Amino acid sequence: MDATSLATLWATIALIIFLGVAIYIKVPGLIAKALDARAARISSELDEARKLRDEAQQLLGQYKKKRKEAEQEAADIVAAAKREAEMLATEAHKKTEDYVIRRTALAEQKIGQAERDAVAEVRASAVDIAVEAARALLAAKVDVKAGADLFKASLADVKAKLN
């Protein structure tokens, strides 16, 4: 036997002794327990992860529902604001039209009064001019006493006709 074969023999014997001691002190059982414990821990973590995922899905559903409700509420608020704005605009338009109608009527009344005042003033001026012209004409043709009597009578006649 040469040295290499002897070394191989001793290595094989050492390996068999090592495996025998390992089996005797139950190393494979310890390794199996450790692997089983790790598998149980991983399984537990997976179950917990599933629970967390389910809770997250529920929360997501709730938040989606709340978001949808909030969007609907916002849309309702916007619609109500639009309706109120339209109502206010209509009311303001109506008030403006009423104001314009009142101001137009007032302006027409003032114009009518101004026209009546102008006509009365023109008539009064025309009467004054006619009276003055008649007085001047009669003064030239009639004596003073007869002219004064005629003037008074004419003046009374004109006043009676105008009033």
From Swiss-Prot:
GO cellular component entries: plasma membrane; proton-transporting ATP synthase complex
A Pfam family recorded for this sequence: ATP-synt_B
Domain of life, source organism: Bacteria
Principal location class: membrane
InterPro entries per the UniProt record, alphabetical: ATP_synth_b/b'su_bac/chlpt, ATP_synthase_B_chain
Membrane topology: Single-pass membrane protein
Transmembrane residue ranges: 5-25
Subcellular location: Cell inner membrane
Keyword list, A-Z: ATP synthesis, Cell inner membrane, Cell membrane, CF(0), Hydrogen ion transport, Ion transport, Membrane, Transmembrane, Transmembrane helix, Transport
An example Gene Ontology molecular-function term: proton-transporting ATP synthase activity, rotational mechanism
Function according to Swiss-Prot or TrEMBL: F(1)F(0) ATP synthase produces ATP from ADP in the presence of a proton or sodium gradient. F-type ATPases consist of two structural domains, F(1) containing the extramembraneous catalytic core and F(0) containing the membrane proton channel, linked together by a central stalk and a peripheral stalk. During catalysis, ATP synthesis in the catalytic domain of F(1) is coupled via a rotary mechanism of the central stalk subunits to proton translocation.
Family: Belongs to the ATPase B chain family.
Quaternary data: F-type ATPases have 2 components, F(1) - the catalytic core - and F(0) - the membrane proton channel. F(1) has five subunits: alpha(3), beta(3), gamma(1), delta(1), epsilon(1). F(0) has three main subunits: a(1), b(2) and c(10-14). The alpha and beta chains form an alternating ring which encloses part of the gamma chain. F(1) is attached to F(0) by a central stalk formed by the gamma and epsilon chains, while a peripheral stalk is formed by the delta and b chains.
UniProt name for this protein: ATP synthase subunit b 2
Organism of provenance: Mesorhizobium japonicum (strain LMG 29417 / CECT 9101 / MAFF 303099)
Gene this protein is translated from: atpF2
